[in-house]
């Protein structure tokens, strides 16, 4: 093991991850590049089609609603047919959405349908990701596995920026199209289709994990039962959902809801914000997102060490609280390089807490409740994005670009502060520090 590897504990533990965990990380890298391309370029594509910012916000809201409606059914289904099947189904839905979007042209109804289908597929994958990793990792390696997976998500942002900003433009130029025109976005969609096909193929290599499949004896000795333990109340619960401690559930998901409301006003539309304020072209804009993702990768990989030093809860509170001043700079600085720096540091700090929070949350509930918690977290996040997206659209329609974004940034700062304070207060003293 090299000194660099020792400095990044997630990478040092990679060889000790389960075979399926390593395959899942590979699938995350491949399909995650397609997902990142969607988040970076989808709104820009709609703007290139001539849609107003308020209309783009409504498309985002409808997509969030579709994701919200998918989360609990996907969670319940995964308990019956296995996480792998739901992962594959989500990838198939995403692939179908891309094909539909490519064929849609400027038909708004078809575009909305494609966005909804994509969001549904993405949510199906999201709600089973944390339970799948928890069920394919040993307790002493869980923080590292979650950290590496989150870091991979940000590596894919860098890959996506290169594919979207350089490769797609070069391909479009070679074919005689305008590198800044609609054809380049359609090349990006084609690249996404290829990535999703490869990602789906990787998912099919995962071992069968339907309920009849048992966990390894070693995990059972460590107190980790089968991935799908039988709960005598499950048959009586609505949609197969079992929640033993509702108060704890609320405390785990409410901070995320507040962040979701704030994030829904800004994060999906950061590409439009940066482009509109500074006039960047497609390649430059993708480059900005690549730079911001790089710092996040490093921060996420060192977060397990922070968790061991300060404890899971304290480390999450520290990095999230430190990110808030950079939100202020991001929203209100008139200088491009300070906005890029603020975006990079803010992303690094805020996202660095995500893998540790996910691991912490999975450990706060019984094994049979993990998928339910993941679904509840996803649903409340998506509901937050619905409210946030509606508020964004209203502000853009009523106040215009500058004042509308100013109100949105003030709101996200207040909500992030409240969320961080509540999480720290409710869970002070909880969580592992080793």
What is the predicted role of each segment?
Residues 8-66, 248-289:
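Helix-loop boundary and gating motifs at the non-cytosolic
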Residues 70-82, 168, 299-312, 396-397:
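Helix-to-loop junctions at the C-terminal end of transmembrane segments
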Residues 194-207, 410-434:
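Multi-pass alpha-helical transporter architecture, strongest
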């Amino acid at each position: 093991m090299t000194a660099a590897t020792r400095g990044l504990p997630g990478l040092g533990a990679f060889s000790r991850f389960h075979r399926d965990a390593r395959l899942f990380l590979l699938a995350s890298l491949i399909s995650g590049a397609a997902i990142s391309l969607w988040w970076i370029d989808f709104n820009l594509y709609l703007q290139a089609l001539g849609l107003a910012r308020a209309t783009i916000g409504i498309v985002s809201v409808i997509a969030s609603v579709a994701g919200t409606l998918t989360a609990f059914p996907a969670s319940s289904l995964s308990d019956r047919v296995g996480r792998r099947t739901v992962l594959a189904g989500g990838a198939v839905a995403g692939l179908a959405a891309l094909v539909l979007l490519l064929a849609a042209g400027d038909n708004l109804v078809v575009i909305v349908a494609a966005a909804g289908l994509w969001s549904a597929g993405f949510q199906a994958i999201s709600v089973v990701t944390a339970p799948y990793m928890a069920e394919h990792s040993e307790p002493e390696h869980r923080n590292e596995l979650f950290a590496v997976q989150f870091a991979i998500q940000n590596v894919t942002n860098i890959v996506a920026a290169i594919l979207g900003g350089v490769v797609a433009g070069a391909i479009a130029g070679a074919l005689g199209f305008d590198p800044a025109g609609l054809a380049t976005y359609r090349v990006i969609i084609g690249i996404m289709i290829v990535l999703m096909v490869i990602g789906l193929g990787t998912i099919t290599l995962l071992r069968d994990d339907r309920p009849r499949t048992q966990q390894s004896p070693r995990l059972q000795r460590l107190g980790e039962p089968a991935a799908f333990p039988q709960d005598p109340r499950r048959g009586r619960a609505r949609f197969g959902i079992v929640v033993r401690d509702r108060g704890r559930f609320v405390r785990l998901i409410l901070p995320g809801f507040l962040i979701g409301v704030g994030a829904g006003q800004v994060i999906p539309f950061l590409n439009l914000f940066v482009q509109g304020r500074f006039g960047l072209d497609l390649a430059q804009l993708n480059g900005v997102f690549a730079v911001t993702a790089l710092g996040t990768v490093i921060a996420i990989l060192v977060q397990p060490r922070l968790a061991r030093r300060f404890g899971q809860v304290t480390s999450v509170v520290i990095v999230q609280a430190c990110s808030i001043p950079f939100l202020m700079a991001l929203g209100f600085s008139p200088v491009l390089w300070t906005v890029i720096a603020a975006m990079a540091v803010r992303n690094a700090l805020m996202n660095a807490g995500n893998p540790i929070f996910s691991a912490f949350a999975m450990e706060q509930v019984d094994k049979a409740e993990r998928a339910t918690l993941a679904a509840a977290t996803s649903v409340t996040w998506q509901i937050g994005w619905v409210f946030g997206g509606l508020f964004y659209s209203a502000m853009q329609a009523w106040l215009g670009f500058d004042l509308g974004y100013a109100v949105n940034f003030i709101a996200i700062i207040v909500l992030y502060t409240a969320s961080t304070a509540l999480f720290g207060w409710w869970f002070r003293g909880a969580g592992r520090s080793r």
